[in-house]
C-alpha cells in the first residue's frame, strides 16, 4: 500500500515519498528502464521493482499489517502476499536511509523518463 510505504520512507529518511522518491532517477516510481543513476535508484528502487516483480498475482494496493516500534519497522502476520509486499517496502525504506549520502536532489529528482534510455536492467 503506497500510504504505508510512504510512512516507512518518512520514518527511515525524514522525507516524504512524494516528491523525494516518486519521480527519482530511472526506477523510482512506476516501472523503469535504462541504467540506474545512483545507489538510491539502483540498490533501492530497482531492487524494490524486482522484489514486487517476483510477487506476481499479489495485489500491491492491499493494506498489510506492520508496526513502527522502538525505531524499527516490523512486518506483521497477514496473508503470504501481504507479508512479502511489506518486506519489499520495508527493505526499500531502509535502503533509502542507508543511501541518503548518494541521494542527488539536483540531478535525479523529477528526472525525465526520456533520459532513461536503453533496455531495462535484468533482476
UniProtKB/Swiss-Prot annotation:
It is an enzyme of class 3 (hydrolase). SUPFAM superfamilies: Phospholipase A2, PLA2. It comes from Bothrocophias hyoprora. Its main location: secreted. This is Basic myotoxic phospholipase A2 PhTX-II. It catalyses: a 1,2-diacyl-sn-glycero-3-phosphocholine + H2O = a 1-acyl-sn-glycero-3-phosphocholine + a fatty acid + H(+). Its cofactor is Ca(2+). It is found in: Secreted. InterPro entries: PLipase_A2, PLipase_A2_Asp_AS, PLipase_A2_dom, PLipase_A2_dom_sf, PLipase_A2_His_AS. The active site is at residues 48, 89. Disulfide bonds join 26-116, 28-45, 44-95, 50-123, 51-88, 58-81, 75-86. Optimum pH is 8. Keywords: Calcium, Disulfide bond, Hydrolase, Metal-binding, Myotoxin, Secreted, Toxin. The lineage of its organism: Eukaryota, Metazoa, Chordata, Craniata, Vertebrata. Its EC number is 3.1.1.4. Monomer. P-bromophenacyl bromide (BPB) completely inhibits the catalytic and edematogenic activities. Enzymatic activity is also diminished by EDTA, heparin and crotapotins F2 and F3 from C.d.collilineatus. Inhibited by divalent cations different from calcium ions (cadmium, magnesium, manganese, zinc), since they act as competitive antagonists of this cofactor. Pfam families: Phospholip_A2_1 (PF00068). Snake venom phospholipase A2 (PLA2) that induces myotoxicity and local edema in mice. In addition, it causes neuromuscular blockade in avian neuromuscular preparations with a significant direct action on skeletal muscle function. Myotoxic action is exerted by both enzymatic and non-enzymatic mechanisms. PLA2 catalyzes the calcium-dependent hydrolysis of the 2-acyl groups in 3-sn-phosphoglycerides. One of its GO terms (biological process) is phospholipid metabolic process. Coiled coil: none annotated. CDD domains: PLA2c. Belongs to the phospholipase A2 family. Group II subfamily. D49 sub-subfamily. One of its GO terms (molecular function) is phospholipid binding. The keyword Hydrolase applies.
Amino acid at each position: 500500500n503506497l500510504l504505508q510505504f510512504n510512512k516507512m520512507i518518512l520514518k527511515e529518511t525524514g522525507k516524504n515519498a512524494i516528491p523525494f522518491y516518486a519521480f527519482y532517477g530511472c526506477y523510482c516510481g512506476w516501472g523503469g528502464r535504462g541504467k540506474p543513476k545512483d545507489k538510491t535508484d539502483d540498490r533501492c528502487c530497482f531492487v524494490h521493482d524486482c522484489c514486487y516483480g517476483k510477487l506476481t498475482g499479489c495485489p500491491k494496493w492491499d493494506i498489510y499489517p506492520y508496526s513502527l516500534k522502538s525505531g524499527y519497522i516490523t512486518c506483521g502476520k497477514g496473508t503470504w502476499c501481504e507479508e512479502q509486499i511489506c518486506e519489499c517496502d520495508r527493505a526499500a525504506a531502509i535502503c533509502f536511509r542507508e543511501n541518503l549520502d548518494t541521494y542527488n536532489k539536483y540531478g535525479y529528482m523529477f528526472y525525465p523518463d526520456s533520459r532513461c534510455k536503453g533496455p531495462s536492467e535484468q533482476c
